[in-house]
């Protein structure tokens, strides 16, 4: 049994008004885990509106993640504090609609496998929760899952890596290409008199392309 044909919806959680997956990773974790959580970034304590529909919640980590990240409060506060920009993207959220005829045991088993294979095995830290609520429009059962994913990679020591890195553009011989000043025809130097080379910025992971 897989979630291959089950409806999913992905959004970005971030500080920008254009992010539709929430504006605080801690708030989102509080919501899906149905627990009170304090945000060290904004000083707010987030309270879940209700918790009766919570079936299961769990944090899943890659091998290089600190064991303390098993605590969702520690994980998502670390995510928040690693981002300095006022418009930073913080996390990716998924809502997965599950078949209402599934048992809780099957739902947990399938979602753990789905999260492990698609996200954790690629290096992401993930929290998922399963809710069993009532559809307010038709009164029917609404079994579904929420997933919250990190956007930054972790290095071998368990520290957050930059989302992007600078790489030098090389010529056909594999050598760096000088950055030439059009006015002087000479290679540019910075304020420390260091030579400048053509470069570009690339993402440190390809998670945003999936």
Describe each region flagged by the PLM.
Residues 1-210:
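N-terminal nicking endonuclease/strand-transfer module with a His-rich metal-binding environment
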């Amino acid at each position: 049994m897989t979630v291959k044909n089950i409806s999913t919806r992905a959004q970005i959680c971030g500080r920008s008004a254009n992010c539709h997956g929430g504006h605080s990773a801690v708030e989102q974790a509080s919501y899906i885990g149905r627990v009170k959580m304090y945000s060290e970034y904004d000083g707010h304590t987030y309270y879940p509106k209700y918790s009766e529909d919570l079936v299961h919640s769990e944090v899943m980590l890659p091998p290089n993640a600190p064991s303390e990240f098993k605590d969702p409060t520690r994980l998502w506060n670390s995510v928040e504090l690693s981002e300095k920009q006022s418009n930073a993207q913080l996390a990716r959220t998924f809502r997965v609609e599950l078949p209402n005829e599934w048992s809780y045991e099957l739902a947990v088993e399938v979602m753990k496998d789905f999260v492990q294979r698609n996200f954790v095995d690629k290096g992401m830290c993930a929290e998922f929760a399963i809710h069993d609520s009532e559809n307010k429009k038709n009164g029917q059962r609404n079994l579904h899952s929420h997933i919250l994913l990190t956007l930054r990679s972790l290095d071998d020591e368990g520290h957050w890596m930059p989302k992007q890195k600078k790489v030098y553009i090389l010529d056909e011989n594999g050598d760096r290409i000088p950055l030439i000043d059009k006015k002087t025809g000479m290679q540019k130097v910075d304020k420390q008199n260091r030579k400048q080379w053509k470069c570009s910025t690339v993402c440190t992971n390809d998670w945003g392309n999936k």
